[in-house]
Amino acid sequence: MKIDLITIFPEFFRGPLDHGIVSRAQKAGLVEITIRDLREFTHDRHRTVDDRPFGGGEGMVLKPEPIFECLEAMEIPPRGNRENVQVLVLSPQGRLFDQTMALELSKLDRLVLINGRYEGVDERVSEVLADGEISVGDFVLSGGELGSAIIVDAVTRLLPGALGNADSARQESFTAVAKEISEGPDSTCASGGLLDYPHYTRPAEFRGYVVPQVLQDGNHAEIQRWRRRRALEKTFKNRPDLLEGAELSKEDQKYLAQLRAGKD
């Protein structure tokens, strides 16, 4: 997979992309990440990438010309003629990024992320070049770079071979897409759209805090049952909105009814 990051602050990505899973995936040839400096596609001595908004108002807007020229230099086909390639603009007005979207993007051959700054990007970029706009949350950041780093990490870890253990992606929070991530039969650990269950490691006892006994006993059926219930509890407490779209068994629903009764 290829990922292109179009930005006026290329140095921003030196840290986030040079560590952990993203770094290992690049070294293994699973993903090729290229940072495109938008200022290289300007033609004045000040390397101007922004200008005042039409109609007045505060702030500056990223100009369309450098972005158009950047994509042309990358030989990105016109919108409508792209095969397994997407161009997305980071914007607070965009589609909310989630785990399902991360899986969708991980199946692309190429992903181009245009990082907005200031008051945003000239709308003609979205109207003509981009396949859509994407947002990482209902808040405003100084620019799209932080959001892009999040997207790159979330997408890269879903690429085949990026994680040491294929089960890791299936068991994580929000994995309603567990069946698609799984290469084999459905896993009993798959979260099915719930938040992740609690994790513990050695030592079993630390300063009086003890790992739950069920996790130490080695009964896999009981461990799975315990983990599922803890995931239900966490989701019920912290993100009840996720329960509407979660994959719930009759046992799950019965346990949730008990939680609701206890809460009331």
UniProtKB/Swiss-Prot annotation:
HAMAP family: TrmD. GO terms for biological process: tRNA N1-guanine methylation. NCBIfam families: PRK00026.1, trmD. It comes from Koribacter versatilis (strain Ellin345). Keywords: Cytoplasm, Methyltransferase, S-adenosyl-L-methionine, Transferase, tRNA processing. Its EC number is 2.1.1.228. Specifically methylates guanosine-37 in various tRNAs. The lineage of its organism: Bacteria, Pseudomonadati, Acidobacteriota, Terriglobia, Terriglobales. The keyword Acetylation does not apply. GO terms for cellular component: cytosol. It catalyses: guanosine(37) in tRNA + S-adenosyl-L-methionine = N(1)-methylguanosine(37) in tRNA + S-adenosyl-L-homocysteine + H(+). The gene is trmD. This is tRNA (guanine-N(1)-)-methyltransferase.
